[in-house]
C-alpha cells in the first residue's frame, strides 16, 4: 500500500486539509476495508480499477469514478476489484460548502457523482483532465484551478459555523454546544440549521466524530495503553462511554481495532 499526502495552495489551505493518493496492487483475495467517519468531506477520483461499496451483507454498488463523499456517521465497507489508484481532495468540515450549491445534508452518508454537483459537461472535462494528467502534481494543479475558479463564484460559510467548528477541533470535541453558545443561547436553532446546510450533520454529531478521531490517534500511536487511559485522555465520561461511541462509529470494539485486517486502510490515515 502506498499512501501519500500533499499540501494545498495557500489560498485553499483554510478549506482543504490535504490531497492524498492511494495505490494498492491487485490481489487474488482482496479484503474488504472498513471506512470510518472522520468529519471531513472527500472529492475522489478513481484512476484504477472499480471499487465496490457494500450496502448490506453481500449487496454492493460500484463507486462512481468521480464523486464526493459527504459526512458519514457510520462505518461502511469497500473492496477493490483489482488494482487501486485514487486521487482525493480532503476538505475540512466547512470546506466543501464553499464550492457546492446544494445543502450538504443531501450529500451525507453517500457518494454523489460530481456530475450531480457541477453539471455533466463541467464534471466530464474535470474528470478527463484528472485522468489524463501524467502525475499527482499535475492533478493538484488541475483541481486547484477548478476549485479556485469556483470559489470566486460562491458565498462563504457563516462565522458562527466556523467558530463552532474551531472550538470543537481545539477541544477535540469535548465542548458542549450549549457551552459554545452560552452567551447566545437563542442561536441554537440557527446553528443547527446552518450546520445541516453547510456541514451535513449536526454540531453535536460532528463533536462526537472529532472526539473519536482524537481517541483513535492515541489508540494507534500509543499501542499498549489501556482503554481507561485512552478514555480519560479523550475526556469520555468513562471506559464504557468510550467503547459505546467507538462501536457506534467503527462497528468494532477498540481491542479488536488494532491489527484487524479490515482496518488496514483506515489505520493508514492516522500514521
Language-model segments: which ranges?
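Extended amphipathic alpha-helical scaffolding segments in membrane-proximal extra-membrane regions
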Residues: 176-177, 194-198
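Catalytic-pocket segment enriched in acidic/His residues
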Residues: 189, 193, 201, 205-221, ...
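Residue-level "edge-of-site" marker
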Residues: 209, 244, 260
